[in-house]
Amino acid sequence: MKRMIVRMTLPLLIVCLAFSSFSASARAASEEKYWDHWIERHAQPLDASNASNKDLRFLKKVLKGKRIVQLGETTHGAGEINATKVRMIKYLHEELGYDVLAFESGFPDTNASYLNMDQLTPKSTMKNSIYAVWHTEDVVELFDYMKEQKEKGDPLILTGFDIQSMKNSFNVAATQWVKAVDPEKAELLSQSENDFSTLVTDSNTFDEFSQKKEKLVKNYQKLIKFTKTHASELKENLPKEPKAYEMFMHSLQLRIDVMETYMLEEMKEKLEEYPENIEDFSFFMRDRMMAEQFQWVADTLYPKKKIIVWGHNYHLRKQNTKMIKDWVQLNGPNMGDYLPERLKKQTYTIGIYAYSGASLDSSDNKTVKPVTSPPPSGSLEALLKAADRPAVFVDFLHTKNKKGTSWMYTPRTALYWGYMEEQMILKEQYDGVIWLEHITPSVIIK
């Protein structure tokens, strides 16, 4: 009897599934003709040659009620992406009152460099604070602007939220501050910073790592105790900036936290000892800790400030675990997943993508990675070509699902670093996107 039922129902099921699939495809095809028309009418042109920035006025309406604006990027190594973001940052600061810029770079490095900005050239501040992939003329212009704004009394404050650091950047600045109070403690700090930077790379066994780590943790605990007991003297010698003492203390504690969690996992993975749960890999742990750092910046360091975030699309998008397919094909949690809902509600997240061109590979800042061109049919990059402009912005957050916008609400391909296919529902990952027709590799300056 069961076999008879199967024989009778299986053909019917196949027909139903086939019809359902055909209907969905037919419906999508019928809606596609409306997509181009909607994009032509509603994609906001961006004109870098417009000195008055009239083309950016739409941001006042789009960002209403949003305390945090996240500016993503499909690749770290493209000049046009950097230039677009720098221009938007200036507008956001001058016209909409965003006064903090948080980079995807080390918290200790960015804050120490900002505190010492008065003593450094814009180029030196840039090199001491953010990763080398952004050491370009476009970004020097941003740091020049930050220095000017600080001198005018309307600062655009630099900070960071990453747990990875650059050797010597925080070390040089912090050692000078401590040396004025206690030269011996300054030497302890300098040596600890040097040992911290090589803790994983110079350890060959887990026991060796553990012994070095325990010694370093004790060193930083001594430095934290010293900082607390000599708070008034240190504050006299720290740069005369609000929160300088809090930044210094947090940087010291962060060193301990990173050693006890992220570096511990890095060492295990170096020895090919892998965790059972995907979120415990150092790759995903970094995003969790970046979310924690950003939360501290937003809630404790600058609780009343409006904040701009500069980072990669991957880290900033809303919820990587809801991706259909991400670039590593694991859909593990990203920084956006880990942020608390109350901060997410205050945030407008912008992804940036490119139609053609090339960018640098950030692994060496030399290798050129071409953008897949033409992009896949039906992809985000391909669809926004219909705007027939060199650069456009499209708002997702305030756009309802209808015939002309269904592409935002249905599975869509977009390219990571311009050449690796990811699949997502755009509305779930971004509040808006910037599309650039062409990008070129960044020129890294020495």
Swiss-Prot record:
Family matches, as Pfam families: Erythro_esteras
Protein EC: 3.-.-.-
Enzyme class of the recorded protein, top EC level: hydrolase
Protein name: Putative hydrolase YbfO
Species of the source: Bacillus subtilis (strain 168)
Record keywords: Hydrolase, Signal
Residues in the signal sequence: 1-28
Gene Ontology molecular-function annotations: hydrolase activity
Database matches in InterPro entries: Emycin_Estase, Hydrolase/PRTase-associated
GO biological process entries: response to antibiotic
